[in-house]
Amino acid sequence: MSLSNNQTQFVTVFVPIQLSIDVFRKMNNINSFVNDNLTNFPIVTVDQLIKVVNNNNNNNNNNNNNNNNNNNNTSISNNGDINNCLATFEQVQNNCFETCDFKATEREHYFASGKQIQESVLPEEEEEKISVNNFAMVTVEPNNCFVKAQQINSVAPLSLDNRNCVRRAHREVNTFVQVFDVCVFNLKVVNVATNESQVNLFNGGNVENICFDRSIQMPRSSADDFDWSSQQQSSWYSLALSIIPIYHEIILVLCNWLVVAFYKYWQHQQQKQLPPHPLNIIVPNVSKRIAVNLNNQLISLTFTNFLKNIFFLNNNNNNNNNNNNNNNNNNNNNNNNNNNNKTNNNQLNLSKEICNENLNFEEFNFEDESVCKYNRLTNSCENISKIQQVNEESELLDWFSDFEEMDSVLLQNGTEFDNDHPMVKSQAPSITFKSLDQFIKYLEENNCVDDIEVSPCSKSHTFNRPVSTPRLIIKPTWCVYGDSLNTEFFHSCLKDKTCGDIIVDHFEPLVSSPTDFLLSNGGQRILDTPNAGGSSVWSEVLSFEVLNQVFGAQLKKTETEIEYAPGSKITDFSVDINNSHIGVSVVRIINFFDLNGRTYKAVFTPEYARNLLYKKLFGVIASTEAVVDKWEKQILYVWTTSSCVADIIVQEYWKVPAKLRSNTLVYVNHATNSEFLF
């Protein structure tokens, strides 16, 4: 395995370092200590180690020079004093093993010098003693990113969990101590040496998922019989350790895929195969090409077979049987006899058109793809050469032309819609009644004025509703409360496109000024968009906010964005509720109560409520008929200042003719402390 040399990679690792006891004392200013208290000392960092090494340079010049001569190929300058630094590292017998800082599920093995080392692997695990194994000891120079390995004896493995267990370990008081540090290495070159020979395993590149100790360590089991004196054996073994996990995953994926494929094949074989049945189908060839007898043959009606221009006819035996059956049916029923004779004549005419003058037809042989020309009079069969290759493009066009001819026949009965068709006219924007008087006159002429049928859905949309508990919906700047079944009735009415309903809720603002309302994107869009005139902008904004926050409506078009036929009634905005296009008209009842003086200016009578409902419901019907982008239903949103007014509106709503109520949902909000709405 090799990596590119033109990139600089950084890796965060846990580095265990073995220090002599003298160095450890000097770094921590300790004169003496006991084994039990050794783990309570602070962690020794690499920077502290380098500082101690630099302080000891003057005392170790001779040893440093000797060690530099033995390690010419492995030393790299460390701030101008790498020789002294490297020699001191070897003098204190530091042992550094790096592992990548990434999530690992398996246990990593680290090593320290000594015969037996006792260490706690995890807080919940027991301490264990591991026997001595051979291992390649690694020395790391952190600042220069250089790694070298030496084969030594009497090295015991330490078992540590990756990332989570950074521990201090110790052997004997008078030898050396192993401490851990977290370092960031600029990894450029990683060399492994065995018996003064170097093998370049890694050379830069991406080190995201590489654990380097796997590539440079010896076997994790006993390897006394393995000859590590050979450089090639060491490199090949290291390379194998890095490749085996990859092939292991590939083999698992392939095995899984083979098992699934075998199971699907076995399941397919277990399915029962249907036996072939003869085809007794008569299909005319409108283009008057050959007709093929496929009786007692099994063929799938696929697109490829249509490209070959294969159609089906009954043979003589089946024709005789069908004629006998038809004769029996004719004896039983004279009416059926005439119909069957007509169908038989039509079939004979089709057969005469398809077959030639000598009553010849051609039979297709599926085994060798040849055609047999058969003469009915002489009962002779003449083999013809294999069917010629046809032009697939022309055959495809002819095939679709046959269907076009069939469609033209079907549409002759009036199923083809043009612009004058009633269904097309109903979808086009129009104005049938220009005023309420015309609509009432139409109701009187058709005896619909007294038709006050509640609804075709008497169980869901009636004034006889069950008693239920109240509900309260609180938002940051307003709240709505009313019957707990109102939400259910609201959505149920929207789903029913044939009838209307009326629902009453109470609205209470939680702020004193309308500018303090927290608006949704749709509400802010209505507020910022100029309307068609009037001072009802806040009533429209809050109407949408209630529909959005309580019933899940999403704004589709504002008042000026909706298109109508010229001279029609208009709607304030349209919304989308559960993928249904709904129009919304907003009405305010403000002439009967003095909000500032808190007194009634006039009495809201049932007659006024009835006239108001007639006028507004007619406007809803007119705008629905004249709108270009058709909606499925419309909501008449009514704002009132008194609960008495809301009660009167509910009573008079059910007295309105059913054709005027149409499928409009009337939603009444009794608002208090909402002078800005009116």
UniProtKB/Swiss-Prot annotation:
Membrane topology annotation: Single-pass membrane protein
Membrane among keywords: yes
Transmembrane segments: 243-263
Keyword Repeat in record: yes
GO cellular component: membrane
Region (Disordered): 55-75, 318-347
Residue spans of biased composition, Low complexity class: 55-73, 318-346
UniProt keyword annotations, A-Z: Membrane, Repeat, Transmembrane, Transmembrane helix
Subcellular location: Membrane
Broad class of where this protein is predominantly found: membrane
Note: Several proteins derive from AAC-rich mRNA, which, due to a frameshift also have ACA and CAA codons and thus are Asn-, Thr- or Gln-rich.
Name by which UniProt lists this protein: AAC-rich mRNA clone AAC4 protein
Origin species: Dictyostelium discoideum (Social amoeba)
Taxonomic classification: Eukaryota, Amoebozoa, Evosea, Eumycetozoa, Dictyostelia
Annotated gene: AAC4
